Amino acid sequence: MSRVVLAMSGGVDSSVAAHLLLRDGHEVIGVFMRHGEASAAACRIDSDEPQNTNPLNLPVLGDSAGGKRADHKQGCCSATDAADARRVAMSMGIPFYSLDLQEDFRKIVDYFVDDYLAARTPNPCVKCNHWIKFGRLFDYADGVDAEFVATGHYARMVHSNGRSELHRGLDGHKDQSYALFGIDPARLSRMMLPVGDFTKPEIREMATSLGLGVSDKKDSQEICFVTQGHHSDFVKSRRPEMVGATAGEIVTTGGKVVGEHKGFEAFTIGQRKRLGVAMGEPHFVIRIEPDTRRVVIGRAEELLRPGLVADQCNWFVTREELADAQSVGIQIRYNGQPHPGHVVMDGSDPTRMKVMFDDPQAAVAPGQAAVVYDGERVLGGGWITHAIDHIADGSPPPA
């Protein structure tokens, strides 16, 4: 029997994951990671945690509400979520602890804000998985001598012949493997993803049959900490000194000024809605120029790019294994599909790669992840620095 630290969010996926781990005979420790930005007191829950189960000396939240469920509306790990997670853990008889990771999560928020202010499109979920869910949680697991860390992600771990591979989840509509590419390769052998072998309807049905009380709970939103308004409003609230500093012109690809905008952080490559100009036919954001503060718009065909360059690459395979992959596809957005193409690691720096698609792809957005698949298997990926505008324009920029 293995000891497993399970990230419990209070949602249906991690709740059923707890059941599946227990069913398979594991010793489960449930951990709720408190990293939202409402007051810590709003999310305090019962914990009789002995001192030796908190080796990192992270703040452990006690109970200030008499154990009653409170409905604190917060997009990320709310008090309601904490209460739901605790209730599920108690019903299954597993120990449950809440760790205050607000300080760690602030760097996720800062990254999100800084990327938009640099005219990139961030993906905070990927960073959170890397830094917190499969970062800090592993630190905690090491401290309690847990062999594995588990979550409710819709992806699959394939452990065989001494190898550990990350694969797509069985439910193609819910697959989250894209958001896991940044995990330390050395940790794959200690990861467990119990719900990845099921579809979402199957997980909800299982939760109902188990009487968990969270079977009809809504899925979490894409940007968990932006709970109201547009993301640009959140960016301005975090960097009020930048209000007005990113305003500029909206121009066509031909250079014609057609309008003005209040801040380029409100835009992303491929965006069609909320452009603030009427062109008579559909126009999209083609590129954002932070130096001139211009937002360049054009027709759909002007979005197409033959390739991209990425850095900060993380690989689960060797250079030779990448070269030998038979059906490589590159996914460039969370809800997208892999596109066939050719991937080349930088000759001197494996943390950089060039991708050339078999067919040009639309909306290659700097700041987003480019994740490389061989069929169902995740080979690795990196962060898009820029799109390649022409076939000949393929060399990675100088370091």
Swiss-Prot record:
Principal EC category: transferase
Family to which the UniProt record says this protein belongs: Belongs to the MnmA/TRMU family.
Lineage top rank: taxon: Bacteria
NCBIfam families for the chain: PRK00143.1, trmU
GO molecular function, one term: tRNA-uridine 2-sulfurtransferase activity
Gene transcribed to yield this protein: mnmA
Catalytic activity: S-sulfanyl-L-cysteinyl-[protein] + uridine(34) in tRNA + AH2 + ATP = 2-thiouridine(34) in tRNA + L-cysteinyl-[protein] + A + AMP + diphosphate + H(+)
A GO term from the CC aspect: cytoplasm
Predominant location: cytoplasm
Cited function: Catalyzes the 2-thiolation of uridine at the wobble position (U34) of tRNA, leading to the formation of s(2)U34.
Matches recorded under InterPro entries: MnmA-like (IPR004506), MnmA-like_C (IPR046885), MnmA-like_central (IPR046884), MnmA-like_central_sf (IPR023382), Rossmann-like_a/b/a_fold (IPR014729)
Name of this protein: tRNA-specific 2-thiouridylase MnmA
UniProt-annotated stretches for the region Interaction with tRNA: 174-176, 333-334
Keywords: ATP-binding, Cytoplasm, Disulfide bond, Nucleotide-binding, RNA-binding, Transferase, tRNA processing, tRNA-binding
Site (Interaction with tRNA): 153, 368
